[in-house]
Amino acid sequence: MTVTQTDLFPYGDYLNSSQLHMEPDVVDTLKEGEDPADRMHPFLAIYDLQPLRAHPLVFAPGVPVIAQVVGTERYTSGSKVGTCTLYSVRLTHGDFTWTTKKKFRHFQELHRDLQRHKVLMSLLNLARFAAAHSPAREAANENIPSLPRGGSEGSARHTASKQKYLENYLNRLLTMSFYRNYHAMTEFLEVSQLSFIPDLGSKGLEGVIRKRSGGHRVPGFTCCGRDQVCYRWSKRWLVVKDSFLLYMRPETGAISFVQLFDPGFEVQVGKRSTEARYGVRIDTSHRSLILKCSSYRQARWWGQEITELAQGPGRDFLQLHQHDSYAPPRPGTLARWFVNGAGYFAAVADAILRAREEIFITDWWLSPEIYLKRPAHSDDWRLDIMLKRKAEEGVRVSILLFKEVELALGINSGYSKRTLMLLHPNIKVMRHPDLVTLWAHHEKLLVVDQAVAFLGGLDLAYGRWDDVQYRLTDLGDPSESADSQTPTPGSDPAATPDLSHNHFFWLGKDYSNLITKDWVQLDRPFEDFIDRETTPRMPWRDVGVVVHGVAARDLARHFIQRWNFTKTIKARYKIPQYPYLLPKSASTANHLPFIIPGGQCATVQVLRSVDRWSAGTLESSILNAYLHTIRESQHFLYIENQFFISCSDGRTVLNKVGDEIVDRILKAHEQGQCFRVYVLLPLLPGFEGDISTGGGNSIQAILHFTYRTLCRGEYSILHRLKAAMGTAWRDYMSICGLRTHGELGGHPISELIYIHSKLLIADDRTVIIGSANINDRSLLGKRDSELAILIKDTEMEPSLMDGVEYQAGRFALSLRGRCFSVILGANTWPDLDLRDPVCDDFFQLWQETAENNATIYEQIFRCLPSNATRSLRALREYVAVESLATVSPSLAQSELAHIRGHLVHFPLKFLEDESLLPHWGAKRGMIPLEVWT
């Protein structure tokens, strides 16, 4: 039996196949051998969105769009229309595939819109539009495929043939760019400018919806009412991707909200949960978003599709992971460590140079005029100049700065913001928070193209650059005086000095000693603020790390969460000039645009401390990882940290890092295990103050809580260890600092090396690197915001542990080896074996080196802090005696030859007879204790 068109469309509604004949469209032709993926839209297209009706280029030129009607659904609408037929249309565009569901009347509406478009274009003044519309005019002269005026949607007869007719109709239209890119067609196909960007993942779900205002779960955005007067409905274009959704204003194309999926994600459909007919409710930790669809069928379909999309590559963010982190462990991640700022800054400079799309930076302090490679002979490696050059190339630079309380801190983030924002429109800087707060954004992060991420303890700021030499002086070319190469007070302080013959490593404000004097006048960057002819600088020791791939995506997602959160809650950033940021999909994370050489593969997990004030959610995974790593350690712990304030009393100090260390040592003692704990701390807190008179109130406050953790009071580590094992605690734990020496003005000088690292190494297999100090501020989550990564080695190499052959992780072993080599001065100790950190011989060598160095420094410089000064009276008497370095410089120099490395014992008895906590009458004494802990 032959099926005719009359059989298919009994009311004369058949498709006229002769009208479907079209000339080929040369615009939609791929070159032979060309990959369609190469024609897809670049990621930077997200920053240049056009109004939806402005006919933006949605589809990739030359890449065909293929439609296939794969099935039908028949349902009862509940109205007088009766049974309706729904056509499922599967579309393919390059590697993108998606499905849309349409009624026959939707095809008819599309047909009418295209006919009107064709007629309008044919009536245009040809001369006026000759230049801009000649391709469109030629296409308008082509015939549009015909579509019946109506049809018997209730008939099920010959359904497959009817599907084929509609399929042919769409495919003929989609071969013509004139119709394919028209807004009526893109709305029909549910596509937009964000549909075909490979780094955003799959096509996802899109379409016109109405969304309800409100629903934010952040301070200042909660409406107390539930009546309709408390909210409004707005028409928006919704885009759902695999780990987030957004909606845009159709009239401008601007993204007006981004909602990241997280463990609070849930989709509900129906009036009971949405208070709206045909409503869809999408919950996350930050917002409850309510959408209104055109029918219950659409609401149910959208709810199902959104749920399925979230279960794709972005499903990792729908639950908490190990240590209650938002990000899971990422195996096979390429990571590289950096000890000191020189290597870290140089790698950051190389990464910035290779940026093609985005640069994200967040710092506690950022100095725009910092030089990333030194000594500088031009401005090529100056941070602000580099960012300007990349912005001019089209790279989008987004910077988040901590907005300090100006009376308490002199980092002048306002100057940093103004300086950077004036460089180029593609550089955007936001500061947070506005309200006076006790807490800070303390994290340090730089992400390039959401593919390579740097983090650790290093701000891109003054005083941080250093190398293994830990120089105390910087006088430039010895044949020239120091002030010949630095701006004088009468010159322009903002002007860059002539660098063509520069020999300085630290220019202007970069030459610093934060205990001698805190930074001032940061708007005069190249003007010295301490006398480098008489005052040594304070060396800065720090640790950083770079990660690639999915772990970098996780760090970028954290930055995006904070950026979008800040944009949402601060009115001044709601303008389009500060765009919402979008996370790239994990599905493309392995396509690395470049790598930082020298890395090793390991399993990497991103950790953080955040609160609702800082990022809109609460997390303390850094603390959890510290506690777990200490608890599960088998052989040793190596800790470098700027602060060590722990041992919970349930009131003043809450974190239990110190308690876990005590428990682990007691366990080793009970079981007769060989277990070592190495702790390195700065000999003095990094606050301005005269230590010869006891230091300022800030120094004393930090010393009080540090000694309370280490050795003073019933909660301290050593008090509890001594109670259990007496002096045997010395077999398990070493507490040290770092010091170095040099020469200035013909006299020997010495200064402590300021340890700013935030590092934990356990068993040569596990490493934690980040911005978090060991104190409540950094670890509780409810206070400062912090970032860290947990690295577990997967690539092993032979080593030793307590004299026994041991498989050590390459990342952890190489990092510890580097740290120990510099600390112990291995360059002057050729037979030094650093492989076994646990055996008695090495531990004894470590302790003896620290003791010998400390003794020599004290004899020569009478340096502070010292165990010889247990009271303020003893301190005054101690500093009144001239040092050997002053009395006999030549003899002092000969004695200094016996110094090995930089290791010295931490003076546990310094001012032990004094109360170091600021008294209530002092200005610092009025500050809540939580600020110091």
Swiss-Prot record:
Modified residues (Phosphotyrosine): 11
Keyword Acetylation appears in the UniProt entry: no
EC top class, as a word: hydrolase
Coiled coil: none
Mechanisms controlling activity: Stimulated by phosphatidylinositol 4,5-bisphosphate and phosphatidylethanolamine. Inhibited by phosphatidylserine and by oleate. Is not responsive to ADP-ribosylation factor 1 (ARF1), nor to GTP-binding protein RhoA.
SUPFAM superfamilies, sorted: PH domain-like (SSF50729), Phospholipase D/nuclease (SSF56024), PX domain (SSF64268)
Post-translational modification: Phosphorylated by FGR. Phosphorylated on Tyr-11; most likely by EGFR.
Source superkingdom: Eukaryota
Residue ranges annotated for the PX domain, each copy included: 65-195
PROSITE patterns per the UniProt record, alphabetical: PLD (PS50035), PX (PS50195)
GO biological process: cellular response to phorbol 13-acetate 12-myristate; G protein-coupled receptor internalization; intracellular signal transduction; neuron projection development; phosphatidic acid biosynthetic process; phospholipid catabolic process; positive regulation of cell adhesion; positive regulation of cell migration
Protein topology in the membrane: Lipid-anchor
A cellular component annotation (GO) from this entry: caveola
Tissue expression summary: Expressed in brain, lung, heart, kidney, stomach, small intestine, colon, and testis, and at a much lower levels in thymus, liver and muscle.
Localization terms from the record: Cell membrane
Region (Catalytic) location: 441-788
Alphabetized UniProt keyword annotations: Cell membrane, Hydrolase, Lipid degradation, Lipid metabolism, Lipoprotein, Membrane, Phosphoprotein, Repeat
InterPro entries reported in the protein's UniProt record: PH-like_dom_sf, PH_domain, PLD-like_dom, PLipase_D/transphosphatidylase, PLipase_D_euk, PLipase_D_fam, PX_dom, PX_dom_sf
GO molecular function, one term: phospholipase D activity
Subunit structure: Interacts with PIP5K1B. Interacts with EGFR.
Reported function: Function as phospholipase selective for phosphatidylcholine. May have a role in signal-induced cytoskeletal regulation and/or endocytosis.
Protein name: Phospholipase D2
